[in-house]
Amino acid sequence: MGADNRRTTETGYVNRRGQAVLRDTGLPGNDHNQRTYVLRCGACAHEYGANGSDIWQRRCPACDGGAEGLPY
């Protein structure tokens, strides 16, 4: 997978594990000063919430052993 030069919280950003940012929910995350973003897995299309600070390293909770997503 090629490098994505967007900021990790920008809609459309895809991390090295194939997780794409769909949108900012505007809801607070569970990490200090973070918001919850909706991500979609490129492999299985599962959608889940994640802290903005975690997007760069997230794995899909449905097919790649990632942590459970945040509610949104």
Please identify what each model-predicted range represents.
Residues 1-37:
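Short, intrinsically disordered terminal segments enriched in charged and Pro/Gly residues
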Residues 2, 44-47:
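Intrinsic low-complexity, intrinsically disordered segments enriched in polar/basic residues
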Residues 20, 63-64:
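A broadly tuned preference for mixed-charge, low-complexity surface segments
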Residues 30, 42-44, 53:
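Generic structural motif
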Residues 41-44, 60-63:
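Short cysteine-rich clusters marking metal-coordination/redox-active sites
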Residues 48, 67:
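Cys/His-rich microdomains that often coordinate metals
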Residues 49-59:
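Short linker/helix segments within small regulatory modules
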Residues 70-71:
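Short, charged, intrinsically disordered terminal tails
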